[in-house]
Swiss-Prot record:
Protein name per Swiss-Prot or TrEMBL: Polyribonucleotide nucleotidyltransferase
Species: Prosthecochloris aestuarii (strain DSM 271 / SK 413)
Recorded catalytic activity of this chain's protein: RNA(n+1) + phosphate = RNA(n) + a ribonucleoside 5'-diphosphate
Classification via Pfam families: KH_1 (PF00013), PNPase (PF03726), RNase_PH (PF01138), RNase_PH_C (PF03725), S1 (PF00575)
GO molecular function annotation: 3'-5'-RNA exonuclease activity; magnesium ion binding; polyribonucleotide nucleotidyltransferase activity; RNA binding
Residues in S1 motif domain copies: 641-715
Entry keyword Metal-binding: yes
Amino acid sequence: MSMFIRKEIDLGSGKTLSIETGKMAKQADGSAIVRLNDTMVLATVVSSKTPPSPNQSFFPLQVEYREKYSAAGKFPGGFFKREGRPSEKEILSARLIDRALRPLFPDGYYQDTQIIISVISSDQINDADVLGGVAASAAIMVSDIPFQNSMSEVRVGRVNGEYIVNPNINELRDSDIDISIGGTENTICMLEGEMDEISEAEMLEAIRFGHEAIKKICALQNEIAAEVGKTARTFSAAKAPDNLRQSIAEICSNELKELAYMPLCKEERAEKTAEIYKNAKAQTLQRYQQEITPEVIAAEPEKALYLNEQIIGDAIHSIEKQVMREMILDDAKRLDGRRLDEVRPISIELGLIPRAHGSALFTRGETQALVTLTLGTKKDAQMIDTLTDDADKRFMLHYNFPPFSVGETGRVGGTSRREIGHGNLAERAIRKVAPAESAFPYTIRIVSDILESNGSSSMASVCGGALAAMDGGVPLRKPVSGIAMGLIKEGDRYAVLSDILGNEDHLGDMDFKVAGTADGITACQMDIKIDGLDYHILEQALEQALHGRLHILDKMNEAIQEPRTEIGKYAPKLTTIQIPVDAIGMVIGKGGETIRSITEETGAEINIEDDGTVTIASASGEGASAALETIKLLISKPEVGTVYSGKVRDIREDLGAFVEFLPKTDGLVHISEISNERVAKVSDHLKPGDKVKVKLVDVRKDPRTGKTRFALSIKALAEKSADNGASDKAEANR
């Protein structure tokens, strides 16, 4: 029978975080509820007890984070009125939790494991994502699932120089830091966030501050786990016996070492590595197949490992990893021959996509991003509806990673979680220097298509995104660049790597992406695979990243120093004016008739805000100007001598035609003012619904009714046209 336990901790600033277990979801292997004010998160974990396949070599961990609309007393949108597939926010939150938890499961634990985090209550000011990380860790800690250490996640903000743990959305609006930190009592294992160009020292200070809160929450989890008192289940990690690994090393370690010291391109290295793997497997199997017969395996089942191709492949991989790490630590030499702090060669080309509003091809080594800019109007903004925010998103960056970029075939279709995560990081990096809506009222969409990848494609998207925006005339406050840092650590020896390759990411201990301007950091993301990362290593990584960023910015400045003064040739031209609030109805017209008419005549798109801000968009400057003039006329007072576009409302055969020349304002075109020729019947010249240009020739008040009467003329315009024609003819005859 489950035991109910509830404990809480004071986070400061009047915030109390509580963890409870033993009340809900008791059939899961572990469950926990974390609460901060009225935001509550339920996390459950279930890990299969069926042994994994002997050939399995990965940990099938699935983390799902879902925000229930009922948690905030809301109805989901759509016809079915129920939650559907995960939103982008839910996917990003799930990744945040997954990345912090995954390194803490023991090596060789390959049981199918599923963690489901559900937001069951939301006060709509406290985001639940980092609470989900705490709840997930607590659920594992009270289960029998093997887990190395409790993990906690916090968000750190800074308002007026004061650091805050788990700032609410109101505090975040005034904060210059928004960073999520995941860690254990001993170390930091995950970072992700955005900042207003803060220094490396300030970044470290924020991490230290957050880690202190993490230690307290981890201690709380440990207390609860001790009271529950479950013993971790045992498991058998299938790995190569020592003498098998030694035999494999004798076969392939020298070849792998020789290959490591060859500065080859990615494709050549992959081909030669595959050949070494193939030969080493064949020689190993040949060596043991005669010795280990079915009878031997029946007597000693563990001997089957000597003939397991997956186990042999894993052993070769571990030798390859060891060779690369020793080369870096012993000789300060990398797979492609670079120094530890050296950035790969960079090339940049701008404006190569003729119809895009801005474009850049950014190539760094064997990583290449084709980035395009599209500018749109307010109606192109993305509508965001989450538990804590309802807003229009007017800056977005989308990242695409097709399989051909790594020389593979694969599924092409929906956006993967990885693509969403990488795009979000690049978006946050550039958004910090994007212009305010008041200065640049466009919706901005940047798309990064990765054409080649050998590490650090998200940071290539940052650089390419900033370049494409500047090429398209987006007035970024400053250019932004990004770099991915790596780490190799063995005991007290370590090496920090700048601009890591795919292999260095895969075989190394850290992936630390840092983006920013010349003046400070705007975004970061870090994943650590080891326990015990020292702060002095983080400090060195940040300092080395700064030098790398500045080097990349210099290369970007060679291509373009300032945003172009004009937007792209094919981008919509926007004009903004302010009209009185009481004139909004006049511009829109009955049932939208007036605004539709302007759109049809000018080809411009018109958007009107409740405060009277009118934004006019058109593919041509002429269309925007025509729409602007029409709107100005609509809201202006009638002036004698002004020409208006009107619509015939009614005709009187013996009197003339009544024309609506301004919304709800009619004037009379007397029968004598229709044409220079004699008009016998008005209907011979005009019909109700006809659109005509008229000139206001007189305004007077009716002495009997007191109403203002407007006298209009079509003839006056014809006379003016004739006069201009005669003048032109006379000029030509001179």
